C-alpha cells in the first residue's frame, strides 16, 4: 500500500496529540494501523484518523516511523511480510519489527447514532482546562455540566438527550475530544467507551464513568434546584456587562482567557473587575435590577452573552445562580464574603 508522506506524518501527529491529552499511552510510543485507519491508543483514549489506503493490521514503533518520515519527501510504500514491516521511500528502506494489535482494538462501531450538531461546542463551553480542581464534564438527559471537585458544579448547559444518561468524562478525556476536532457527526455509546466521529472522519474514543461516581451526586439534582430557585432580579445584563469589560482600558482577549471576573451589583449599576498577567482592569455599566451583592465568575459565561443579552439572578440554596436564558448557560456561584 502507498500513503502520502505528508498525510501519514499529519495523521501520526494527530493521533499522538489526542492520546497525549489523556492519561498516557497504553502501548507506549506505538502507531497502530488497521484497515481504513491510523490509530493511537492510550489507557483511556483512542484516536483514529481515516486512511483508505491502509489494508492490513499491524503495530510499529512511533519513534522509528517518525525518523523515516523526517528523511524523505517521497510517498511511502508500506509492505508487510511475515515478521516485519518495510517502509520504502525513494531509494531508502526501513524495516521494522511489528506486533499484532490486540484483538479488541479491531472492534469498531458499524452503526453511528445521530450526534447533537453542537456537541463539541457545548462540551467546550463547560470545560475549565486551567481551573484548579477541574474534574471534567458530566451530562444526563437534561444538561451538560462542568465539574470542579472543590466546589461541585460550576457551569451547566442545557440539552443532550441523544447521549447516554449519567455519564462523566474526566478532564483528560474532555481535552482529547476538543483536540480531535470541532464538528461532531456521530456518537456511539459502546460501554465503557463513547466513540465520537468528526466531520473529517477522525474518531476519538474516550472511556467514561458513571456520574454517580462523582461526589457531587446526581446531576439532575442541580438542574431541578436551579429551576426551582427564586428570582432575585432580572435585567438586560448581557450587552452592558460586555461593554463594561471590553471598555476597560488595556484589557484584551478576556473572552479567550481563563481569568476571574469580579462582579459587584448595586441598584442601578454594576462594576466589573478582571485580572490577567498585565494587571487589573475595571469597567462600569448600568444595571436595571435592584440586587446588591458581589460574586466572582470565570470569563466564559460572558463569552456566551454574545448570543444573548438576557440574564436572570436567582437564589438557589443560598447560592447565586446566574442564568443566561437564551444563551443556554447556567452558573451556580457562591456570593463572595
Predicted regions and their residues:
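Structural preference for solvent-exposed beta-strand-turn elements
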Residues: 1-337
Amino acid at each position: 500500500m502507498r500513503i502520502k508522506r505528508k498525510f501519514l506524518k499529519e495523521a501520526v501527529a494527530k493521533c499522538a496529540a489526542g492520546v497525549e491529552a489523556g492519561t498516557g499511552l497504553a502501548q507506549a510510543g506505538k502507531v497502530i494501523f488497521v484497515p481504513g485507519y491510523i490509530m493511537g491508543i492510550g489507557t483511556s483514549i483512542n484516536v483514529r484518523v481515516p486512511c483508505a489506503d491502509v489494508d492490513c493490521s499491524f503495530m510499529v514503533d512511533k519513534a522509528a516511523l517518525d525518523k523515516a518520515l523526517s528523511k524523505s519527501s517521497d510517498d511511502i510504500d508500506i509492505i508487510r511480510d511475515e515478521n516485519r514491516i518495510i517502509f520504502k521511500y525513494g531509494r531508502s528502506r526501513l524495516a521494522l519489527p511489528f506486533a499484532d494489535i490486540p484483538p479488541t482494538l479491531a472492534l469498531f462501531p458499524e452503526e453511528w447514532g445521530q450526534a447533537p450538531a453542537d456537541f463539541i461546542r457545548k462540551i467546550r463551553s463547560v470545560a475549565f482546562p486551567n481551573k484548579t480542581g477541574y474534574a471534567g464534564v458530566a451530562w444526563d438527559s437534561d444538561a451538560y455540566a462542568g465539574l470542579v471537585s472543590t466546589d461541585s458544579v460550576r457551569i451547566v448547559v442545557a440539552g443532550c438527550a441523544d447521549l447516554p444518561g449519567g455519564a462523566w468524562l474526566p478532564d483528560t478525556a474532555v481535552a482529547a475530544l476538543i483536540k480531535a476536532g470541532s464538528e461532531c457527526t456521530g456518537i456511539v455509546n459502546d460501554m465503557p467507551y463513547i466513540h465520537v466521529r468528526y466531520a473529517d472522519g477522525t474518531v476519538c474514543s474516550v472511556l467514561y464513568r458513571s456520574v454517580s461516581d462523582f461526589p457531587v451526586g446526581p446531576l439532575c439534582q442541580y438542574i431541578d434546584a436551579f429551576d426551582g430557585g427564586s428570582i432575585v432580579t432580572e435585567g438586560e445584563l448581557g450587552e452592558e456587562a460586555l461593554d463594561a469589560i471590553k471598555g476597560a482600558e488595556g484589557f484584551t482577549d478576556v473572552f479567550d482567557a481563563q481569568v476571574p471576573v469580579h462582579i459587584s451589583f448595586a441598584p442601578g449599576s454594576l462594576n466589573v473587575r478582571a485580572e490577567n498577567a498585565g494587571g487589573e482592569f475595571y469597567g462600569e455599566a448600568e444595571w436595571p435590577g435592584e440586587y446588591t451583592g458581589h460574586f466572582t465568575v470565570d470569563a466564559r459565561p460572558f463569552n456566551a452573552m454574545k448570543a444573548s443579552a438576557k440574564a436572570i439572578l436567582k437564589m438557589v440554596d443560598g447560592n447565586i445562580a446566574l442564568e443566561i436564558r437564551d444563551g443556554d448557560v447556567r452558573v451556580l456561584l457562591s456570593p463572595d464574603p
